[in-house]
Regions:
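Short alpha-beta junction capping motif
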Residues: 21, 87, 92-133
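Aromatic-Pro/Gly-enriched surface loop or interdomain linker
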Residues: 10-92, 98-99, 209-210, 216-244
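Alpha/beta-hydrolase-fold catalytic nucleophile elbow
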Residues: 24, 124, 206
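Extracytoplasmic/secreted envelope proteins and their assembly/folding machinery
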Residues: 57, 61, 108, 112, ...
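Alpha-helical scaffolding within the catalytic cores
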Residues: 75-82, 104-110, 185-189
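Bacterial N-terminal signal peptides
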Residues: 1-4
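An acidic, glycine-rich "communication" segment
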Residues: 29-37, 128-216, 226, 230-231, ...
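Surface-exposed patches in mature extracellular/periplasmic domains of secreted proteins
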Residues: 70-80, 123-127, 155-164
Length: 244
């Protein structure tokens, strides 16, 4: 059983933008939250792919404009569907809550082609069983993500990253990966999607939710230190993707 994703309110990004933050819109699996008001009304917080939109997208692109030489602005974000060939126009795809994805064969094929062409994927806001549970044959959100990647790019593999990887020093010099997630008592892990030559094609923020920090940092509603780290990580990810 699946729920159709609610339509987004994504606008067309400015044609002058060098970088567009492309968020993947997907059909979701049946899902259950521990909170009754969300369990009984799954769309009360929006579909999983929508979480933290559009504030987090606007915040990251705005900071890229202010802190780097990348030509972009706070309106340079866009929602995309994997079935649409427009994904090949964007070097960076952002997945929110990928543990709830329900991809069809064409979406899987396009995702594989996108990655092989050099596109970079970022997976965020998913975690080990505890807060959320998927009803179905796969219950661990990471395994759902791994499942689709193994179909899309079976020759690639997910590896645990440590602080020595260049992505953590691309623009900001990240001092530690030991950070607190915005909620829960999970311990964040950083996983990379690498090809047979060890080249990095994507990163997964497991047991973490950088987008949640991005959404709230300028509102004074987030813990300052991990929120700053999460923003630095996001900018590093984008610049790494654009330069590799």
């Amino acid at each position: 059983m699946v729920f159709l994703a609610a339509p987004g309110t994504s606008q067309d990004p400015p044609k002058s933008s060098e970088f567009v933050f492309a968020r993947v819109q997907f059909t979701q699996r049946r899902w259950t939250h521990i909170w009754p008001e969300l369990r009984d009304n799954p769309n009360s917080a929006g579909p999983p792919w929508w979480h933290d939109y559009p504030k987090s997208d606007r915040f990251v692109t705005g900071l890229l404009q202010e802190l780097t030489r990348v030509r972009t602005d706070p309106t340079s974000f866009h929602n995309v569907e994997l079935e649409n060939p427009e994904i090949f126009n964007y070097p960076f795809l952002y997945f929110s809550e990928p543990g709830f994805m329900n991809l069809n064969d064409q979406e899987v094929a396009n995702l594989g082609e996108y990655i092989r062409r050099g596109g970079f994927v970022m997976a965020d806001d998913f975690r080990e069983p505890g807060i959320f549970r998927i009803v179905g044959e796969m219950t661990d959100e990471f395994e759902v993500f791994r499942h689709y990647l193994s179909r899309a790019v079976p020759e690639y593999r997910l590896v645990r990253l440590d602080l020595s990887h260049p992505i953590f020093h691309q623009f900001f010099d990240i001092a530690t990966l030991d950070m607190d997630p915005p909620y829960g008592d999970f311990r964040p892990q950083f996983w990379g999607l690498v090809d047979e030559h060890g080249k990095l094609h994507g990163i997964a923020d497991y047991n973490n939710d950088l987008g949640d920090y991005w959404e709230d940092l300028d509102q004074g509603e987030a813990l300052v230190r991990p929120a700053v780290w999460s923003t630095q990580l996001g900018i590093n990810y984008v610049l790494y993707a654009m330069s590799h």
